[in-house]
Amino acid sequence: MNDSRQQSLFFITLPDLNKLCAVRIILSNKVADTEIRTIQMKMCRQLLFLHQDILTSPVSGILNQIWVVMAIPFYKARKLNAYVEKYGAKMEAPQRVIPVILQNCLSYSFMARLAPAWNRTGHLLIQGRDFLSQMGKQSAVVLNINVTETQVCLSIEACTIRLPAPELKEFEISQSIIKDFHANKHAVIERHSILSNWCYVLPSMKMGQIINIFHAIPAACPFHSYGDFQRHWDALYGYKLPGDCGKIKIYCNIYFKMLGERTFTYPLSCIRSQPMQFFPRVDSEVVLKSFLSDLKSKLPHICGFPIKMTSKPCYYTQELTKPNIQEHKVKPPNLTTKKMLRASLTQATSRKPACAQSLLPCSVAVDHKVELSVSQPTSGIFSALHLQPESVQGRKKSLSIRAPQVHSEVLMPNRGNTQVQHTNLSSQSNITPKFVPVFKNRLLQMNKNTSVLGSPKRKQHDVTQSKLFSLKTSMIQHDKLNLGPAIKNRYSSNIQMQAANNLNQENSRPLQEKNTESSENMTKFPSSRGKSTVSLNKNKQLSNSAVFVVSNNNLGVVKSAVDFQMKGKENLTGKGITQILGKSHGSLKLKRQPHIFESDGETEDPRLLQQQSENQAKEVGTSDHRLIVSKIAHRSKRKLCPESSKTSKKHHSDTVHYGQSSSSKKQILDSDKSKLKKSLIIHNA
């Protein structure tokens, strides 16, 4: 059964459609409605057999129009004009051939040219010109045509059918009536005598109702003899009706409900009492070869252009689809789908001691490197763990900016300040690593705001920074020549502690101003890695010396530093005290410019500072060092007690009123400039 219903595919190469044209023929309006359909079908078949280089087809759904496809030279030859004028029809202007028009014309032309070898019956083409009189099985094919711009696909299915001619008893007519009907030539079987009056009418196999059955042709019928019926069926469908053979012919009036009350006269051989019967077929290749042979002989070319047709058939296959999937309609899994998950950017905190990282001004250049690397897309969630160590330090700098409350504890001026500072730094070094999410959009926005808002401030700070940088460098170099190695080290340690204190106060400033100055510092002082190491060594030495840290604007630091230096070195003159006082005032002016203290690190060689620290550690003994530290701590406690309350109050007022207006900041800068000039005058004197 599967072999009988297997479809074979053949392909025909089409000529260039631009070389063809389609013409619409409109029939005359004078033709009666009862004859319009007959004239349409007759003209189509007659044009096909008159001219072998054209294709024709009735316009679908319109009874008075015909499509004709031809080559452009054939149309210019005006070969159809005489025939069209004979029937009083009109021919419209030619138009471009599209696949739909060509498909209709090919379907009709194939069936018309193949008859009577293959006769259209319903959706089948039954083989044999005597198929109407056959009582047994017959060969047939199902032909479907699909047309594209370049080729034609023919789907051919071979089958076996049985379509026997009807007998009167099949319509449930009584035997006595049938006997009387055969005996009398003028007898008529009326409708009430036909119990089963439904029938199938060729060639469409549509169903109709039998109204009556008779031998003589009615006077109202357009055909007056059996020969007229033969010519009519041959002209319209290519059917070859059975011969006369001297037998009395039987006719039927058929009523079609869709066509109204009008009845149509058919020979009994052109109707069937039952539908077509299908049977399985084994030798389908024989039918295919016979059909293709007739097709090539009847249609050797298309509109005068030769065609190329495949000789071997192609078949549909379902081998690529599994039976269980086909039955249950289970969709196969999609292995190419990717889950769209957005990875969050993280950064890891370092386990290194946070002493130098929290107190030093940190590398601004490294900080900008980290922000640029974070702003770029990463390949995974933990890609931040593979950054360099300097990038981790830069990230801790950004974290200290976001959490200024940690540094505010270091700035508390109390008696246990050194212990509190040491415990805070040690607790920070013991913190376990954490993953802190970094938001790219926020960093990009901060960088954009910094670049836009920092441009007017750069011009203002460039002049003051250049002057103060030159003055401060000369003061430090001159001071190093007069002071001893021990006092020189302590003096530089005080400067670095003041720089660290300025950095801690700088963290409480707005983030926008912080980023502005850091971007300036990156452009002016790119060598930040060397400064970090020097400051780290000095901070270690500073923690051993137990020097108290207070705010820069407190003069108690200056007094304690002077007393400490007088004890260490007796030949310290008032010139050095004046330089230290000027230095403290300079640091007060540069309170919001921590990068100037970074420039001090550039004037001093890092290797020289390391050698000095090592020599000092060798010269001073452990016992003497402890004795000096205890004396200094006792003396500084007595002097700092009345001033600690003032310092705390002033620090509180500074933290509360750090967002003051720009006018008050300018006044403070002017006052600091005047103090710095006075100290320089005393120094020169």
Curated annotation (Swiss-Prot):
The protein's superkingdom reads: Eukaryota
Chain intervals for the UniProt region annotation (Disordered) = 502-538, 635-685
Q: Which Pfam families match?
A: DUF4708
Q: Where is the sequence biased in composition, kind Polar residues?
A: 518-538
Regions of compositional bias (Basic residues) in chain numbering? 675-685
InterPro entries attached to this UniProt entry: DUF4708
Q: What is this protein called?
A: Uncharacterized protein C18orf63
